[in-house]
Amino acid sequence: MSSRPLLTLALSLHDRLDELSNRGQIHLVGYDLDVAAVAAVARHECLPIVNDGEVIARLSESTEILQRSYKGSTTIYGVHTGFGGSADTRPDDSSGLSKGLMQLLQTGVLVVENLDIPGLDTPQDVIPESMPSSWTRATTVVRINQCIRGHSAIRHQTVKSLLKLVAAQITPIVPLRGSISASGDLMPLSYIAGTLEGSPDIYVTKGGGKSAKIISAHDALGEIGMEPLRLGPREGLGLVNGTATSAATASLAVLDAIQLTLLSTGLTCLVSEGMAARVEWLHPFIAETRPHPGQREVAEIMRAFLKGSRLVSGLEGEASTHQHTLNVRPDEGLPQDRYPLRTSPQWLGPQFEDILLAHSQISVELNSTSDNPLTNLKTGAIHHGGNFQATSITSAVEKIRTSLQMVGKLLFSQCTEMINHQMNAGLPPNLAADDPSASFCCKGLDINIAAYQSELSYLSNSISNHVQSAEMHNQAVNSLAFLSTRYTIKAIELLGMMVAGVLYAACQAMDLRVMHATFLETVTATLQKAIADLLPNGFEAEDVERSLASAIRGLRNAWWNNAGSDASERCSLAAVAFVQVLCDPSKHHTDTPKVKVCLDLTAKEMRELQDDVRSHLSQAYHKHHSAFLEKPTTEEYIGEGSKALYLWARQDLGIPMNRGLVDHPSPGSIGKRTIGSYVSMIYQGIQDGRLFQRFATVGREVGLGNGGTNGIRKRAYAEYEIS
């Protein structure tokens, strides 16, 4: 097993999705469907194909078993009986049972009016009560895969009709609400079955993109020359009595959740660099002494991403050594990072493990028979059971949703600490690049992310404990899997917004950290040279150097510690600290060797020297500030993985460092955008997969891409496969 199981899985799924999207086809055989294939059909117009001889033979044998049993003395549910709590009825003519089933199930709320609006890729633009088209496409491919296992007595002709709908871009408009996922997702699947029947009162989208239109199922079938399907014995039940909608949407959810959870490790690296963290908490020894696989994987990813950083210290783990290669933070303060950074491997690790388990549960469900009753191809028997109960999916998506909340809580805590100048080790309030008394850059993001996290936390509550008895008390327990999956997808949207906001803020924080650190590096070198001539003669060069170093240290600490001040005041306070240390040995730091050299100045001379130093600092800062905003040098100082994510935002998306009030859009300004517009650009890049593409690429570049496919194509429960 890979030492990085979630990352290995994510890279495998990412590669497979690319492969299938480029190929344009997915061959279904009933036992090796994976979440990447579901996403390829749902989101990338990949076409499912069923042409395997064994599959077709299974379908034929299954229907033959049903036909023989139909004529026998055994009572078969849904063939000789009514449905659910009405199964005690025995219709004289069972040929109309499928029609009766469709009538009882096609009861969802869809306000269908004003449909003559071309160019809509999703019916939700017109019918907000409907499922997204991608969910319906995913549902269709999953139901096909479940049915072709040969246990549902579905004819090959019926499977071909479903495949033809997908190929012709005919997507049923399915109500968003109304499924309790007990006897499967009856109601959503009935609208797909109704489309096959050519119902004039079920609507579909036909075509995609600008050519999409909404028409009736009857008209859509007519346009492609497809005859309405007359459902055979038990076929109506076989189409609807399964977990396909829950499993399909859970597949999309887990794919996105895996990517967002991994991205949180990259974001934590960016925040660590923005905060100039002391990252000995990533040392392998810590994970070895508490060997949870998720914790170990998180730490390993973050170490690789931070490699080469000049903004963090302690990457090699020496607890007593906090020296950075660049002066990037004050010497005082906490000797170790606060919990949102220091315990991030311990916080994120369990989420990695839960999401891996959720993926496993969903993968099994994709390749399971979900129906009742089931035909046994080996014995010819028909078995009544409850494989339609989607509780495995509920279990999976509730783990995912809880994990998303935990990831969101960590990112929220990191971000609000990074924006707060009283906690961020020397960065300006709200990450303002200009004077913080009038400019508030990321303050609104702090509020936004709190709002997102509040909603995310609300959504993380369990759905399964809200089960209501339904359908004549026959479905007294029901999984609510689709409902739980819907809220999980909403949680994914919210976490995506949080990731976008935190990425924007972290890039700003890294820019500011580098801008101020490089300013101090430059100005203190020139200041040391200018002040050296003022020191009295007769002292050893080593003593003079020590005195100047102590004064420079005082200046740097004053600069970082007064990040909440405007530039003019910050320069004054730093100048005072510098001169005080030169003139008063008691102001030297206690952990430095005793200083023997100091200036003997009158109060007036001290003020004059302070003014000179302040003026020097002010001129140097404004020059450096302007040059840095014109051409930031941040990428030269950050880790290899962080650099890739930073440059994705700065170069690929063209999102610049926020310079302050001068960047606010106003009438007549050209090319300026609100902070929200830039965050929205990042969010769009998260939704369409571009950010994870960059993450995956750099993950391989920094040595994290080794490993196999993690079993994503392995057959689930192979001992039950039908050969």
Swiss-Prot record:
It comes from the Eukaryota. One of its GO terms (cellular component) is cytoplasm. (E)-cinnamate binds at residues 241, 336, 342, 372, 443, 471, 474. Its EC number is 4.3.1.24. One of its GO terms (biological process) is L-phenylalanine catabolic process. The modification 2,3-didehydroalanine (Ser) is found at residue 183. InterPro entries: Aromatic_Lyase (IPR001106), Fumarase/histidase_N (IPR024083), L-Aspartase-like (IPR008948), Phe/His_NH3-lyase_AS (IPR022313), Phe_NH3-lyase (IPR005922), Phe_NH3-lyase_shielding_dom_sf (IPR023144). Keywords: Cytoplasm, Lyase, Phenylalanine catabolism, Phenylpropanoid metabolism. There is a cross-link at residues 182-184 (5-imidazolinone (Ala-Gly)). Pfam families: Lyase_aromatic. Pathway: Secondary metabolite biosynthesis; Phenylpropanoid metabolism; trans-cinnamate biosynthesis; trans-cinnamate from L-phenylalanine: step 1/1. The active site is at residue 77. It is found in: Cytoplasm. CDD domains: PAL-HAL. SUPFAM superfamilies: L-aspartase-like. It catalyses: L-phenylalanine = (E)-cinnamate + NH4(+). GO terms for molecular function: phenylalanine ammonia-lyase activity. It is an enzyme of class 4 (lyase). Phenylalanine ammonia-lyase; part of the gene cluster that mediates the biosynthesis of squalestatin S1 (SQS1, also known as zaragozic acid A), a heavily oxidized fungal polyketide that offers potent cholesterol lowering activity by targeting squalene synthase (SS). SQS1 is composed of a 2,8-dioxobicyclic[3.2.1]octane-3,4,5-tricarboxyclic acid core that is connected to two lipophilic polyketide arms. Belongs to the PAL/histidase family. This is Phenylalanine ammonia-lyase. The gene is clz10.
